[in-house]
Curated annotation (Swiss-Prot):
Functional note: Binds to 23S rRNA. Forms part of two intersubunit bridges in the 70S ribosome.
One Pfam family this sequence matches: Ribosomal_L14
Keyword field contains Ribonucleoprotein: yes
GO-annotated biological processes: translation
GO CC annotations on file: cytosolic large ribosomal subunit
Keywords for this protein: Ribonucleoprotein, Ribosomal protein, RNA-binding, rRNA-binding
Top-level taxonomic group: Bacteria
Annotated organism of origin: Ralstonia nicotianae (strain ATCC BAA-1114 / GMI1000)
Subunit structure: Part of the 50S ribosomal subunit. Forms a cluster with proteins L3 and L19. In the 70S ribosome, L14 and L19 interact and together make contacts with the 16S rRNA in bridges B5 and B8.
Protein name per the record: Large ribosomal subunit protein uL14
GO molecular function, one term: structural constituent of ribosome
Family named by the database record: Belongs to the universal ribosomal protein uL14 family.
Keyword set includes Nucleotide-binding: no
Amino acid sequence: MIQTESRLEVADNTGAREVMCIKVLGGSKRRYASVGDIIKVSVKDAAPRGRVKKGDIYNAVVVRTAKGVRRPDGSLIKFDGNAAVLLNTKLEPIGTRIFGPVTRELRTERFMKIVSLAPEVL
């Protein structure tokens, strides 16, 4: 469950290490984002020669949350931390690699590229 001011690790090779959620997209009163939701983020920590730099604003999709995701069969998939993948204005991933597992909930038409790049889909 991600809200404004939440910090997330970055699960791709754009050069960003940590981002902060500045807005949950999808309605003016929307407060929380879960796996598969799009948020607006600010880069808080970045590698020196990365594709993005500190202070840049991007869209991102949440790929892992510590709160977890409830499946229709009753199972709950939780992770150790919160992670996101940076997106461009067309909502395509900026990076060319994804690190760590992602959930099956991302298997929509919009995020099939992320699922195919991920090393493990839970």
